[in-house]
UniProtKB/Swiss-Prot annotation:
CDD domains named in the record: QFR_TypeD_subunitD
The UniProt record lists the keyword Transmembrane: yes
HAMAP family on file: Fumarate_red_D
Compartments it resides in: Cell inner membrane
Family per similarity comment: Belongs to the FrdD family.
Top-level taxon of origin: Bacteria
Entry protein name: Fumarate reductase subunit D
Topology in the lipid bilayer: Multi-pass membrane protein
Transmembrane intervals: 24-44, 50-70, 92-112
GO biological process, one term: fumarate metabolic process
C-alpha cells in the first residue's frame, strides 16, 4: 500500500545547491582560472575592465554565483564523504549546511557592499 502522507525530506534544496555548485565549478571556474591566471598576468585583459565589471550588478551576480554554489557543493561532498567513510559527526548536516549558510550570508553582505 502506498503511504498517502509520505515524510518529506529537507534534502532537495541542498541537492539543488550541490548540483548548481558542481555545474558552476565544472563549466565556469576554468574560464575564471584562464582569465585571472593567464590572460591577466600577460596583459591580455585590462585590470580596469575587470574591476569595472566586478562593480556592475551583473558582475556582482557572477561573483555571487562563482563563490556561493561551489562552497555548497564542497561542503555537501565533505558531509557525505565523511558519512561514506563511517565518520559520523553529531549533527553533521546541521554543521556543514550551517557553515554553507553562514558563508552564503557573509558573501552576500560582502558583495552587496562592494
Amino acid at each position: 500500500m502506498v503511504d498517502q502522507n509520505p515524510k518529506r525530506s529537507g534534502e532537495p534544496p541542498v541537492w539543488l545547491m550541490f548540483g548548481a555548485g558542481g555545474t558552476v565549478s565544472a563549466i565556469f571556474l576554468p574560464v575564471v582560472i584562464l582569465i585571472i591566471g593567464l590572460l591577466l598576468p600577460f596583459g591580455l585583459v585590462n585590470v580596469h575592465n575587470l574591476i569595472t565589471f566586478a562593480y556592475s550588478w551583473i558582475g556582482k551576480l557572477v561573483i555571487l554565483v562563482l563563490t556561493i554554489f561551489p562552497m555548497w557543493c564542497g561542503l555537501h561532498r565533505i558531509h557525505h564523504g565523511m558519512h561514506d567513510l563511517k565518520v559520523h559527526v553529531p549533527a553533521g548536516g546541521f554543521i556543514f549546511y550551517g557553515l554553507a549558510t553562514i558563508y552564503t550570508v557573509w558573501v552576500l553582505f560582502a558583495v552587496i557592499n562592494l
